[in-house]
């Protein structure tokens, strides 16, 4: 988004959860920690999320819901909000991407884009 009042950047760190996975049953658990950084001039509330989850076989699942981990945080200008969540896949590798619907203090609705990020069991990729 080019309007400096509404600039939100999203960064992601992922981890494979070996202790919660069951490879013999095609169950691979991943955690991700997301930081939503409000680089805009307006405080903004994260209202909802939209995820597109693609496994290593190309199967796509879409998830929509209010807020993140039960919250709709208000993120001040120059501030950030960090949270952790997770997902389970049936393949060793996959991707997630999506967007957050944001509402600025002035009432403007805009999307914060979550660029694709990889979920992978260590050693699964060459």
From Swiss-Prot:
Xref: SUPFAM superfamilies: ApaG-like (SSF110069)
Domain ApaG: 2-126
Pfam families registered for this protein in UniProt: DUF525 (PF04379)
GO biological process, one term: error-free translesion synthesis
Name of the protein: Protein ApaG
Lineage, opening ranks: Bacteria, Pseudomonadati, Pseudomonadota, Gammaproteobacteria, Pseudomonadales
């Amino acid at each position: 988004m080019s309007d400096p009042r509404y600039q939100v950047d999203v960064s992601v760190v992922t981890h494979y959860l070996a202790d919660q996975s069951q490879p013999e049953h095609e169950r691979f658990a991943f955690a991700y920690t997301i930081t939503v950084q409000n680089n805009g001039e307006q405080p903004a509330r994260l209202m909802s999320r939209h995820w597109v989850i693609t496994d290593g076989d190309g199967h796509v699942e879409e998830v929509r819901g209010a807020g993140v981990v039960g919250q709709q945080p208000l993120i001040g200008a120059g501030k950030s909000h960090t949270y952790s969540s997770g997902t389970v896949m049936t393949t060793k590798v996959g991707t997630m991407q999506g967007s957050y619907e944001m509402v600025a203090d002035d009432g403007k609705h805009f999307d914060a884009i979550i660029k694709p990020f990889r979920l992978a069991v260590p050693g699964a990729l060459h």
